[in-house]
Amino acid sequence: MDQYHNPANPAAHEASTGPELWAQTAGRITHFVAGVGTGGTITGIGRYLHEQNAAVVVVGADPAGSVFSGGSAQPYLTEGVGEDFWPATYDTDVCDTIVRVSDRDAFLTARQATAAEGILMGESCGTALWAALQVARTTDDPAALFVVLLPDSGRNYVGKLYSDAWLRSAGLLATDEQVADYDWRATQLGPVVQRDRTA
């Protein structure tokens, strides 16, 4: 199958997921946010959305240490998103903005969202959600409609993401800190790579 090189990967999302999001939002979507891994999902959906409305902002959420948000690959803890190479299935022209997300922000956002919404999500979901929250902070349009793709379950991360002891051992949670103490608004927006589509 080779999802990193198979053109059917983005094509499937351009043919199905993109049209579904457009229909479900009645064409009112203004921002689409997703993690970048193979790049197939964000490429396919982003292409479709830009074909419908070039003003839709496609935001790629990328772990700090991955190559998509710039720089060379470095180790990071977030699983299921980011890469240390450029997949053939990722169209670098699709994302209008790429937000770099730290492991701490990804993990703790996922934990807090799970507690608040009852959705057992993995850390790649936390990556996308944190990026969406940060971009939403900079948007003054009251009619803005964000769609955030949350692709993984936290079921496989119970001993890691959902373990305070593990988070502390990884340096993501201070000794005397609780997950509930984390405030995503207190974190400054990480490096953002923006594309000027007016040129």
Segments (PLM) and residue ranges:
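Active-site/ligand-binding-proximal alpha/beta "capping" segment
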Residues: D2-G37, T92, D103-I119
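A short, acidic, amphipathic alpha-helical segment used as a generic capping/interface helix at domain edges
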Residues: A106, A113, L129-T138
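Short glycine/serine/threonine-rich phosphate/pyrophosphate-binding segments
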Residues: G35-G46, S124-A132, Y157
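Phosphate-handling active-site elements
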Residues: E51-G60, V135-L145
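Active-site/ligand-binding loops adjacent to catalytic centers
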Residues: H50-E123, L161-A199
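Glycine-rich beta-alpha junction loops
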Residues: H5-A8, G37-G40, D62-V67, A73, ...
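ATP/nucleoside-binding phosphotransfer catalytic cores, i.e., glycine-rich phosphate-binding loops
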Residues: A115, A143-Y162
